[in-house]
């Protein structure tokens, strides 16, 4: 009986949440409600939705990963130490990647350090975290392998990304080209690109990616628990699945980082798909024990 009541309570709470979210989004997307970047501002102190949602996504992902690490028999002190270094490297990598593609917008080093105002690139974060993880495993010789760590990391990363994308929502960024589809999103004129200043409604690409990230998280979670044969398989699948969605969604984005006439995210995603697919085939066909690599 208690289990039934608990299930009904969760179901009712979830239903109310999604009903509220639907109503709220419909008001924002129609332009009836205009968003603020700030949760509150008191004097010189301000708390932004962007940084709060990024932090929320990280914390939820961290606790899910930590539980999985415990089930894997990993030393949790070593796991926490890796996370500490990985987070620092991920933030630096995410910001550095973004700033390098937008140098003309940063007049000083201080401007480049203002990560709470937005401007983080997931590809830079992944590169920074992976490099740090590799060095940590090589130098520290912990209770886990590098690929075991990356599987834990990438199995929960899409969940954090799905939550973090809503920071773009409150910043009125990461939206797509103009559209008249029923789910079109109103963007105030100050946030519109100059070439689209006469348009009011745009693709909510932040929402597309958030939904895709959630789907990837659930797919990877099922694979992690039921079908994984070798460490590294989940990492490869993350590269493939996330990148497939990113390539499609990036086509609609109006604020993409560019390499010449090529969207950087699409180019890097294509490379990751190739690497992930190849790596997955190699790992699935490998006869080496699970702790290899």
Swiss-Prot record:
Residues reported in the UniProt entry to bind a 1,2-diacyl-sn-glycero-3-phospho-(1'-sn-glycerol): 165
One Pfam match: LGT
Location in or out of the cell: Cell inner membrane
The EC number(s) this enzyme carries: 2.5.1.145
Gene Ontology MF annotations: phosphatidylglycerol-prolipoprotein diacylglyceryl transferase activity
Keywords: Cell inner membrane, Cell membrane, Membrane, Transferase, Transmembrane, Transmembrane helix
Listed GO biological process terms: lipoprotein biosynthetic process
Transmembrane segments: 4-24, 45-65, 81-101, 115-135, 204-224, 231-249, 262-282
Membrane topology, from the record: Multi-pass membrane protein
Pathway per the UniProt entry: Protein modification; lipoprotein biosynthesis (diacylglyceryl transfer)
One GO CC term on file: plasma membrane
UniProt record similarity statement: Belongs to the Lgt family.
Job of this protein: Catalyzes the transfer of the diacylglyceryl group from phosphatidylglycerol to the sulfhydryl group of the N-terminal cysteine of a prolipoprotein, the first step in the formation of mature lipoproteins.
NCBIfam families: lgt
Protein name: Phosphatidylglycerol--prolipoprotein diacylglyceryl transferase
């Amino acid at each position: 009986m208690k289990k039934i009541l608990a299930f009904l309570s969760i179901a009712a709470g979830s239903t109310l949440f999604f009903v509220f979210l639907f109503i709220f989004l419909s008001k924002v997307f129609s332009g009836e409600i205009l968003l603020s970047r700030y949760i509150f501002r008191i004097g010189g102190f301000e708390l932004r939705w962007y940084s709060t949602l990024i932090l929320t996504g990280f914390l939820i992902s961290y606790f899910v990963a930590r539980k999985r690490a415990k089930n894997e028999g990993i030393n949790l002190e070593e796991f926490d130490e890796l996370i500490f270094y990985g987070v620092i490297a991920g933030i630096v990598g995410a910001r550095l990647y973004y700033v390098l593609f937008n140098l003309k917008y940063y007049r000083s080093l201080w401007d480049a350090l203002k990560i709470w105002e937005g401007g983080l690139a997931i590809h830079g974060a992944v590169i920074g975290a992976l490099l740090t993880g590799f060095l940590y495993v090589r130098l520290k010789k912990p209770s886990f392998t590098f690929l075991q760590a990356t599987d834990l990391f990438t199995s929960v990363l899409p969940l954090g990304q799905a939550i973090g994308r809503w920071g773009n929502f409150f910043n009125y960024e990461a939206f797509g080209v103009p559209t008249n589809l029923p789910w079109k999103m109103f963007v105030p004129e100050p946030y519109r690109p100059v070439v689209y200043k006469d348009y009011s409604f745009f693709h909510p690409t932040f929402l597309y990616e958030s939904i895709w990230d959630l789907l990837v998280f659930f797919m990877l979670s099922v694979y992690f628990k039921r079908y994984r044969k070798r460490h590294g398989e989940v990492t490869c699948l993350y590269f493939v699945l996330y990148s497939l969605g990113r390539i499609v969604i990036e086509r609609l984005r109006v604020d993409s980082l560019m390499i010449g006439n090529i969207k950087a995210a699409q180019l890097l995603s294509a490379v990751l798909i190739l690497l992930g697919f190849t790596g997955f085939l190699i790992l699935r066909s490998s006869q080496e024990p699970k702790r290899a690599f």
